[in-house]
């Protein structure tokens, strides 16, 4: 009986039009999006190129975390109509530990500020760890990171967040925490 139920779920899925959209400044989020597309056989596009977003039943949005925001997410998801009939999955990609509860709460609160209430309440949210290569940052991002680093490096240890610690540990380095196996839970959610 379980096999029939599983098959029924798969048959139901064939009528769902899904789209993976990503916002990536330096490439880590793009790598996750393309791998997710490869594994799920779902079309992928950048938020800058997305068209006809309302033709899809399921939107899977991956966005890099920059200065508390998810790159391109608010601009893209505000175009959605008929929210009650959409399935929305949001995946953030950042430097800090995606299993740290304080970090997760901070990210969720920032997402909540960026989205309309109905979109936020419908969204399933996941967090992935990305990477950074300071040598590839543009001038504005290098300056911002230096200012942030200087602001948090001398904080008492108990006042530093997981995000602060990750920035201090990786400052001025090239690090890559990309882990494609972390997509497995997201794929389970999609199917």
Predicted features, each with a name:
Residues 1-85, 188-189:
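N-terminal beta1-alpha1-beta2 submodule of the flavodoxin-like/Rossmannoid cofactor-binding fold
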Residues 10, 58, 68-191:
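FMN-binding flavodoxin-like domain, especially the glycine-rich phosphate-binding loop
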């Amino acid at each position: 009986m379980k096999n029939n139920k599983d098959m029924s779920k798969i048959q139901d899925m064939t009528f769902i039009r899904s789209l993976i959209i990503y916002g990536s400044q330096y490439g880590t989020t793009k790598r996750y999006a393309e791998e997710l597309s490869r594994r799920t056989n779902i079309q992928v596009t950048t938020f800058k190129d997305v068209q006809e977003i309302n033709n899809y039943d399921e939107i899977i949005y991956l966005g890099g975390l920059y200065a508390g925001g998810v790159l391109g997410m608010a601009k893209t998801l505000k175009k959605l109509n008929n929210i009650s009939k959409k399935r929305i999955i949001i995946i953030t990609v950042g430097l800090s530990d995606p299993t740290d509860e304080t970090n997760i709460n901070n990210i969720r609160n920032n997402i909540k500020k960026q989205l309309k209430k109905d979109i936020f309440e419908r969204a399933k949210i996941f967090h992935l760890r990305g990477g950074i290569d300071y040598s590839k940052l543009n001038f504005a991002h290098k300056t911002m990171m230096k200012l942030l680093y200087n602001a948090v490096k001398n904080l008492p240890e108990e006042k530093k967040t997981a995000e602060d610690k990750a920035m201090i540990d990786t400052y001025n380095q090239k690090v890559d925490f990309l882990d494609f196996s972390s997509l497995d839970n997201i794929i389970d959610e999609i199917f």
